[in-house]
Amino acid sequence: MRTEIIVVGAGPTGLMLAYELTLAKVPVVVLEKQRIRNPQSRAGSLQPRTAEVLDLRGLLQPLLDHTLPREEVGGHFAGLPVELDCRPWRTRYPYPVGIPQARLEAHLETQLVSRGVPVLRGREVSSVKQDADGVTVEDIRGSYLAACDGGHSTVRRILGVPFPGRDGRLSAVVADITLATRSATVPVVRKHFSQHIKTAAGYFGSLLPIEGDLYRLMFGKLSGQGPEREAPITDAEVREALKAVYGQQTELGEVREASRFSDASRQLECYRSGRVLFAGDAAHIHLPIGGQGVNLGIQDAFNLGWKLAATVNGWAPDALLDTYHTERHPIAARVLHNTRAQSVIVNPGQDENVGALRDMFIELLRLPDANRFISGIISGLAVEAPGLGPRMVDVELTTSSGPTRVSSLMHAGRGLLLSLDGRNRSVEGWADRVDYVTATSDEEIDAVLVRPDGHIAWSGADGEALEAALSRWFGEPRTRPSATY
């Protein structure tokens, strides 16, 4: 079988990457070792930047029609009782969006299947061979391979790529359960996470309503100790923790799905090994707190997709594909850093010093500037990396066709040159990869060039700088443009 891109892993990262590639008409095949999709809810909500990214492709609204019931409250840092306020970041989604990971995966896979993309399940990878011209995985030949196969990446192991970092010091469980009986302490609606996290009888735990009679239980021992990661999770283990935290009146009904997690923290030194690129948990792992793992993986895919497509479609500038690593590696490193800090602060039972540290952080988070700083990191709205421009705010526009907004103009996954000052600008040499729109807006800006991933590549009025930015990010023009800046 011949294709252009082989994606290994049908989680959110792999599915999002495949979607980006198919928008650019790049042949892609997705391989997944699990025969059926994992039904466990896992991450229970999407961070604001993930919501923005999905909105940039028109993928969010169908999910918003089926969100989980929750109060409109901000995110959290280490479970501290202060809401993270994302409104200063000018986002349409200032609160985490209640969409379980399983539902997101189902939605993305449905989109791929409707576009004719093969998602081949029950295909565990046992052989990866690459040469100067491409990659062979079993009987499939492609130009590149994207390893999106999780923290225990088979591709990474086969290639012998080191995964430096530290082992976990915490052993915890997340489970989708039903309740036979419930006490008054069991929540009926999602609130701020600080109101859900509880400690009792040597355990910490949180119980979040999903839908119907289904709940998401997370628990572990305050000591951090627990069974090995591969140890089976028994009903007795779940029942003991549930009763310890939520009282003897709360009876376990059924354990639907369950898995263990830890605070292990690792990151690849380089996200590329020849013609193999790593994304999502295959490139970095950390304590799964605040939905940052899904956030990172989706944005990895969003950054990589258009660059990989440009490369195989023949218009990528030199070293464009290498900017995937230089832009995404420092962002993930920052997440690993903040989750290590959270792993300490989230556990108040460790010692008095940690309690004092928690109190100090609570005071800091009540300061607007400190809250904005932390909320930008956790939400993914504040992204900083060498050469990476800021995200384009989803502003209201008026075009000749009527009112619209930036995100609605980017569903096709192409670049966008937006002229807001009434001047005519030309992208004729790049018209096969960049859309040109004239509009009016309340924004005080002449014009802006937006990359397919929603980051600003250029803004202002300087025509020569615009042409340089077009060449830098979108390659050489098919025809040399006339100077109509």
Where do the protein language model's features map onto the residues?
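Short, flexible hinge/linker loops that cap or flank conserved catalytic cores
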Residues: 1, 270-271, 409-411, 441
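Core Rossmann-like FAD-binding/catalytic domain of the broad FAD-dependent monooxygenase superfamily
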Residues: 1-358, 362-369, 481-485
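Short glycine-rich anion-binding loops that position phosphate/pyrophosphate groups of nucleotides
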Residues: 151-153, 423, 455
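Short, surface-exposed beta-strand/loop micro-motifs that present aromatic residues
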Residues: 204-208, 404-409, 446-447
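Short, glycine-anchored, charge-dense loop/turn motifs used at functional sites
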Residues: 283, 447-457
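C-terminal helical "tail/cap" subdomain of flavin- and related membrane-associated enzymes
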Residues: 309-399, 406-415, 420-429, 444-445, ...
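Thiol-based oxidoreductase modules, predominantly thioredoxin-like and allied folds used
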Residues: 433-440
